[in-house]
């Protein structure tokens, strides 16, 4: 339920608008609402962190608006709550009016949803399922530089799940489309909410099966097999891609030791 802040409320403050997050001094604000001049704003609790409520305020601040990416190296739980806040703020901003009848909607009090009192339609936040996979060949791992990535970072392959497709089918299809290779021994590892803008990353590991590596230039700048001790620039810690790479490097090292 939303409430108007009196200034006495305390907790973590997620102030978001248009996929941006208020990060005064580069950090997520914490403490009394009055200390951050938030009295009078409309807020809604979206979770708890370290025993304190986490509040969402949907508004633009005059300065200090940044990206939730700046919180990647903080605790994973707090990063996920910040991502939830940014996604919810954008969801409510983009669902002010019903797509069926055009009437104004309001936020549900019991769940993350927008409701239309006119036609009774109910809308939920969009979540885009994505697969991401680390592929091993002996003591090597397949890494690629994506066209949308900056700074020369090399990472594992990933892509969106298509309609009517299983996760396993999506992994095999994405790998074949982007690298021209076939995989085997596919196994699920973990998942990570990824608020850029509203993805859910489902992570896998796999082994190389067959095919000659040939990258898709529309998706990748380059791709190659890298020995575990000769890796290029990698994604930052805290990302599911980095975890997949580190887990695969362990397997590559074990394979190398057994081969000696």
Swiss-Prot record:
Recorded name of the encoding gene: nudC
Functional description taken from the UniProt entry: mRNA decapping enzyme that specifically removes the nicotinamide adenine dinucleotide (NAD) cap from a subset of mRNAs by hydrolyzing the diphosphate linkage to produce nicotinamide mononucleotide (NMN) and 5' monophosphate mRNA. The NAD-cap is present at the 5'-end of some mRNAs and stabilizes RNA against 5'-processing. Has preference for mRNAs with a 5'-end purine. Catalyzes the hydrolysis of a broad range of dinucleotide pyrophosphates.
UniProt short sequence motif Nudix box, positions renumbered to this chain: 159-180
GO biological-process terms attached to the record: NAD catabolic process; NADH metabolic process; NADP catabolic process
Catalysis performed (reactions): a 5'-end NAD(+)-phospho-ribonucleoside in mRNA + H2O = a 5'-end phospho-adenosine-phospho-ribonucleoside in mRNA + beta-nicotinamide D-ribonucleotide + 2 H(+); NAD(+) + H2O = beta-nicotinamide D-ribonucleotide + AMP + 2 H(+); NADH + H2O = reduced beta-nicotinamide D-ribonucleotide + AMP + 2 H(+)
Occurrences of domain Nudix hydrolase (ranges): 125-248
Residues the record lists as binding a divalent metal cation 3: 174, 178, 219
Source species of the chain: Yersinia pseudotuberculosis serotype O:1b (strain IP 31758)
Positions with a binding annotation for substrate: 25, 69, 111, 124, 192-199, 241
Keywords linked to the UniProt accession: Hydrolase, Magnesium, Manganese, Metal-binding, NAD, Zinc
Gene3D superfamilies (alphabetical): 3.90.79.20, Nucleoside Triphosphate Pyrophosphohydrolase
GO cellular component: cytosol
InterPro entries found in the cross-reference section: NAD-cap_RNA_hydrolase_NudC, NudC-like_C, NUDIX_hydrolase-like_dom_sf, NUDIX_hydrolase_CS, NUDIX_hydrolase_dom, RNA_Hydrolase_NudC, Znr_NADH_PPase
Protein name: NAD-capped RNA hydrolase NudC
PANTHER family: NAD-CAPPED RNA HYDROLASE NUDT12 (PTHR42904:SF6), NUDIX HYDROLASE, NUDC SUBFAMILY (PTHR42904)
Annotated positions binding a divalent metal cation 1: 158, 178, 219
HAMAP family (alphabetical): Nudix_NudC
Cofactor(s) listed: Mg(2+); Mn(2+); Zn(2+)
Record-linked Pfam families: NUDIX, Zn_ribbon_NUD
Xref: SUPFAM superfamilies: Nudix (SSF55811)
Residues where a divalent metal cation 2 binds: 174
Subunit structure, as described in the record: Homodimer.
One GO MF term attached to the UniProt entry: NAD+ diphosphatase activity
EC class name: hydrolase
